[in-house]
Structure formats: C-alpha cells, structure tokens
C-alpha cells in the first residue's frame, strides 16, 4: 500500500472540475471580446497598414511568421524559379554559341549534350543541387559558362540557407514548448494569511525544465480618464507571489501563484457580485522562461474573464509523497473546493476586520458542530440489557 500525505479532508466536497467538458460553451448574455485567448493567442486584427514595405525589410522574420501552406509554397517556388531562370541562361549560352544547330559536331560546345530547353533545365538542376554530372558538363570553350556555373552555385547555397533556416525556425518555434505549459481553467479568490488573494495554478507537463521562469500578470479593462478620454485597453501590472517572493518560480511541480489584493491592487474594490456581470475585466497571465534543451526563450499566456473567477474556493492539493518521491496527480489540476470566505471587497475587509474574526470563529466551530451532531445521531453497535446483568 502506497503511503500518501496531504489527503483531502472528508468534510470538503469537490465543487468544480476546471477542465469539465460538460460546461456549456454558449452563454445567453453577450461576453466581452478577449484580448488574449485561453490558449494564449492575441485577439487583435491589424487593418489599414499603409507601409507594407516594412515587412520586406525583414524577409526572414516575415517568412517565419507566414502560415505553413504559404511557407511551403514559397519554398517550392524559390527552387523552381531559380532552376528555370538558370536553365534559360544555359539555353541562351548554347544558342549564342551555336550548340543547338543540328549537324554541326566539329565545334566544342560550351556545355555538352544540351540540345533543347529540357536538357538545359536538367543541367540547371544538376548544377544547383550538386547531384553530379551525367553526359552534360561545362567545357573550357566558354569563360562565360564557367562564370555562370559559379554564380548558380552561390545562388543555390543562399536559397538553401534561407529556406532551410526558415523551415527549421518554424519547426523549433518557442510557442511549441508552451503547449505543455498549462494553466488552470478558472482562477479563485479566497483568503490566505488573512488577506483576500487572487490565485491560479500553473504547471509543466514535461520533465525538461524551464530555466529562469518568471510570471507576470496584468489587468486589462476599459477606463475613462478624468479628462473624458476613453481607454479601451488600459493595462495595469500587478505583482504576483509564489510563496518565496518575487516573480521568479521553480516550476518542477505545479505551483499556485497568487496576488494579494491590497490597497494598490486594481482588484481592491472587486466584489463577488461583480464576477457575474463585470464585462470589462480581463486578467492576463504571462509565463516566460528559457527552454532547458534548446536554450530558446518561450512564453505561455492565458487570460481570465470575470465569470471565470470563482469566489470563496481554493485549489485542492495534487502533490503527494509516494515511495520516497513526490507524485503529481494532474487529473485534479483544476479541482477546487469551497472554503469560508467573506462576501465583501478587500477594501471593506480592511476597513472592518471584525468580518474576518467572525468568519474565523464560524469556521472553527463548524467541524466541531458536525462531529457533535454525528455523535448524537450515531447508533450504538451493541446494548446491555438489565437481564444480562442478573
């Protein structure tokens, strides 16, 4: 029997599975458009860009950013066009030298065995991909042919370097590593050390670590300045805590990242009722680090809308000790349980700490009352009758 530590108390009941597939996908009320999707994609469409030529100043990045069908099309067409272009050059050299005229075999040709455009095209492929010459080869008769041979080899090497490098960068892009960095589907707000905290869980499915991992969080909401200026996407950085202080994390096992809602937090006036009808609140979480195996910087992103924040719940433990090592149960990665939490804003809690004292007293009496009621209702396993004593 495996020894386990950190078993969930029996009085707690699992209330929500964060990855519950049965949750309805469509809602009756209209939701605010996300700035960042749950998978980390930025929901921004760029329109009316006048200076399109700026993209051509960085051709390599433009090719890497293209979709795979477009990249493969450019990859194929670049080689085909270069072969056809130099095939035309070889055909013109043979035509100018008179190598295409039938019945004249006394002159030494510039390139042997070129009698048509098809043979010139085959010779162009043989030169550029260096698969070796067959019956066609360059002679010493035409210095121009030797120069074209050198130019085509250099151009072929440049095309290989650019296109193969582009394909390699697309297959080794950093966002591929981010597919195994996961966030909890829901965030929670509950008490920790007597303060309301915004919490989420983050984990890494791979054994290879993320070096120098840091996590940041921003609140994006629509605001209006005192001068009447409407800012549709006002971004505010808020500090995150991971139990040891600072933004750096050691992501060897899933961690609960939390933000203390204090007077400097944009969530200071957030109430439980605001989570059901708040349309302008979006919390963006960014995890960034260096991939241990490749050394490439990767970034994983997600966001939480107001209705994706659970008030008065916390994440269940998923790390247990088994046979001298720690085991992580990812099936409970998004599970939460209800815990006593004041139904007020952090500002109201700071102004009236008696709410916290009353909550602490009620929670301490709760388990005792449950046990006393259970003992009172329990039936004895056996009874002793007076006749048996006589």
UniProtKB/Swiss-Prot annotation:
What modifications follow translation? Phosphorylation by MAPK1 results in changes in channel gating that destabilize the closed states and reduce the ATP sensitivity.
Cite the intramembrane residue ranges: 117-133
The UniProt record gives the binding positions of ATP as 48, 50, 330
Domain notes from UniProt: There are two PtdIns(4,5)P2 binding sites: A canonical site where the phosphate groups of one PtdIns(4,5)P2 molecule are coordinated at least by residues Lys-67, Trp-68 and Arg-176; a non-canonical site where the second PtdIns(4,5)P2 molecule is coordinated by both KCNJ11 and ABCC8/SUR1 residues.
Question: Site: Role in the control of polyamine-mediated channel gating and in the blocking by intracellular magnesium. Where?
Answer: 160
Q: Which residues carry this modification: Phosphoserine?
A: 385
Residues bound to K(+) 2? 133
Family of this protein: Belongs to the inward rectifier-type potassium channel (TC 1.A.2.1) family. KCNJ11 subfamily.
Show the stretches that span the lipid bilayer. 66-92, 143-171
Q: Name one GO cellular component term.
A: nuclear envelope
Q: Where in the cell is it found?
A: Membrane
Q: One Pfam annotation, family name? A: IRK
Single GO MF descriptor: ATP binding
Q: Which residues carry this modification: Phosphothreonine?
A: 341
Recorded catalytic activity of this chain's protein: K(+)(in) = K(+)(out)
What is the protein name for this chain? Answer: ATP-sensitive inward rectifier potassium channel 11
From the UniProt record, report the name of the gene that encodes this protein: Kcnj11
In this entry, the parts of the chain located on the Extracellular side of the membrane are: 93-116, 134-142
Asked if the record carries the keyword Transmembrane, the reply is: yes
- Where a 1,2-diacyl-sn-glycero-3-phospho-(1D-myo-inositol-4,5-bisphosphate) is bound, by residue? 176
Report residues binding K(+) 1: 130
| Disulfide linkage | 110-142
